Amino acid sequence: MPPTPILILDGGLGTSLQDHYNITFSSDTTPLWSSHLMISDPKTLLSCQRDFTTTAAVDVLLTATYQVSPEGFQRTKTPSHPSGIPRASIAPYLRTALDVAGQAVQDTSASVALSLGPYGACMIPGQEYSGKYDGEHDDEEKLWRWHTDRLGLFDDDEAMEGKGLRERVKYIAMETVPRIDEVRAVRRAVGSSKGFCEGVPFWVACVFPVEDKDTLPDGSTVDEVVEAMLLPVEGGATPWGIGINCTKLHKLPRLVGLFGDAVERLLREGRIQERPALVLYPDGTQGEVYNTATQTWEKVQDKSGADDSRPWEVQLSQVVNDAAATGQFSSILVGGCCKASFNDIKRLREQLRPE
């Protein structure tokens, strides 16, 4: 069996900006969160993203667009847009985000992935850990329309500088999805944006924040999630990769095993024909938990994974190597999410690719 290729993804952009560049965020003043820097401070954004491409030497860098949405821009008040940034004025900022990522990977071998979070990441307070959405976005059809509309923001000559999407990015990342109906909705959004997204592989990564349960916040099992990710969906595109992000590291060994088992079952039953890539980027937290009410990271007594005192990168590299050894995935893309710094990713790369 040939070895499974392993690629390195970057870490948590928002928390890196907070922890290493003293940037502060709040839903009142920066409703776009880390995406706000494409408006306020592209230079600092570039420095932070370069930390990942130079020091950490990642293979894939996510754009600073995770929280992008028409609603988020409308809530963002600037001197030139004191009442909020209208839809007609969004494109130049998206171009800035793509340009900054492009500059960060310049003179490196890294590629860019367009980062797109779930609807819950654009709510105030954020609901990507709960999946508790408002009535206007509470089923697959409504979420499909929202995601299609959000993708449409990028399908703009000014945002793309007249280029196709695949000239600007190598991947699309649909991230931190907490609901099974939203998994299907994002696949349909990519499918219905076929002309724009054509030729750009995408991944869907879900969040598993419920302690002692291997389910999404909506109760969906891994088997159900993998089926929603890979089985035919009317009008939906098939992802290149499936996986897990924004989830505690100690949950990964079991979850990855369940993902692999689900893939094997679908192959055995003839319901899928190809192995997907596995995409993993767990939180880099050391006991901190994000409080959506106070919008801060708080240290809590968390014994859930305390029996493993090995460094984050050692634990994660073992999960990756174990998954690679099964041959269940076509390749593995691994990095970090919240609180994972460029130094963490550098150490992860050194674990997986010792010189």
Features from the language model and the residues they span:
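Domain-level signal for soluble alpha/beta catalytic cores
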Residues: 1-355
